[in-house]
């Protein structure tokens, strides 16, 4: 299973990030120049129609062109029709933070070839609440598995030699559906030692995935 590791040091790292961000920044020696904005490029929107409800993903083809094109290839080839959300990780007792992972795992659908890794340090896209990112083993092995952040997850942006995970969009609408799935029961005997307690007892089917032109009204 292509997957993201869950480090026990996450909460400590997250709290440290908050502490570092709380300091007063040093004044810049020279004012930054404001670049002249170019023509607006619309986000590529995808409607995921799931057994638990709909969610709309706004993808970023400007900052993450490779990863966005890969995801849209699965959409256009209808390869996500019949995919599923199967892994739900919660952090803390309140269950307000975590991630939801989906893709072709556990189905008979076959993935396309792996893609090049687009690191957050290069794209400028970060693991904020609602971010959509690629699951992978080593960098350059991502194919069909993706995850959605519930809450800010700065650790997954990477640091130093860690290239992080490739963010390529965000949930534009349907975070309530994401949270409903996150709260669903877990399988007691699935996931092995690494993912015990993280696999959904009843994976949620992605019935269809289609491009949409404009934001979908709730």
Task: Locate predicted features.
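Cyclophilin-like peptidyl-prolyl cis-trans isomerases
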Residues: 2-3, 21-218
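Twin-arginine (Tat) signal peptide motif
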Residues: 3-12
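Bacterial N-terminal signal peptides
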Residues: 11-22
